[in-house]
């Protein structure tokens, strides 16, 4: 029997191959990074080069789900569109029903449950996306969650998904400290530094979104990103000079 054809059939050694193939699709997607700061959450995504005549505003990997929640994804864009639309409807339905916005965990659990249903149903296939979901709960607490095609979800301080996830996660494990997220600017710089581990040609290939407590989602423009990249480069040069002085 071909165990990789049927979604709902386990192989003898306990694998659901279609779910694993969906996870492989995520690994081929653009790298996305999320970091939870003290009063800010930041999402950064590697921008693929677009065709010369294409409007790059239509190629977005970061989107708002509600006033207090947004997400970035890696994987199949068409699959992500379905998940995003369903999540937005759920956010609106929740607001109409209980007259409060969703918590970040609530909408993450909804997205994870939707993905899980598609791993257990005939005539469907798993969603080929992983998502980083960030936002603020009504008490002002910043949150960061990650979901994968199998329907599992976890809370994180910082995480990465997509093709460069392994090296970016290693960078974050070494560099994520309380001092590194002391201010909003430092948190933004940490995300950019993490992305520069895998992104070529600096800030022009980075898409960045920030959300501060009680403020709407803000997508940074290329000039703002370049300013941060220039500051990071300057800091690197100064650190190199200090090292050389110590060595001599």
From Swiss-Prot:
Glycans are attached at residue 130. The modification Phosphotyrosine is found at residue 153. GO terms for molecular function: identical protein binding. GO terms for cellular component: cytosol; nucleoplasm; proteasome core complex; proteasome core complex, alpha-subunit complex. Keywords: Acetylation, Cytoplasm, Glycoprotein, Nucleus, Phosphoprotein, Proteasome. One of its GO terms (biological process) is ubiquitin-dependent protein catabolic process. Detected in liver (at protein level). It is found in: Cytoplasm; Nucleus. Induction: Up-regulated in liver tumor tissues. Coiled coil: none annotated. Phosphorylation by ABL1 or ABL2 leads to an inhibition of proteasomal activity and cell cycle transition blocks. InterPro entries: Ntn_hydrolases_N (IPR029055), Proteasome_alpha (IPR050115), Proteasome_alpha-type (IPR023332), Proteasome_asu_N (IPR000426), Proteasome_sua/b (IPR001353). The modification N6-acetyllysine is found at residue 227. Component of the 20S core proteasome complex involved in the proteolytic degradation of most intracellular proteins. This complex plays numerous essential roles within the cell by associating with different regulatory particles. Associated with two 19S regulatory particles, forms the 26S proteasome and thus participates in the ATP-dependent degradation of ubiquitinated proteins. The 26S proteasome consists of a 20S proteasome core and two 19S regulatory subunits. The 20S proteasome core is a barrel-shaped complex made of 28 subunits that are arranged in four stacked rings. The two outer rings are each formed by seven alpha subunits, and the two inner rings are formed by seven beta subunits. The proteolytic activity is exerted by three beta-subunits PSMB5, PSMB6 and PSMB7. PSMA7 interacts directly with the PSMG1-PSMG2 heterodimer which promotes 20S proteasome assembly. Interacts with HIF1A. Interacts with RAB7A. Interacts with PRKN. Interacts with ABL1 and ABL2. Belongs to the peptidase T1A family. This is Proteasome subunit alpha type-7. It comes from Mus musculus. The lineage of its organism: Eukaryota, Metazoa, Chordata, Craniata, Vertebrata.
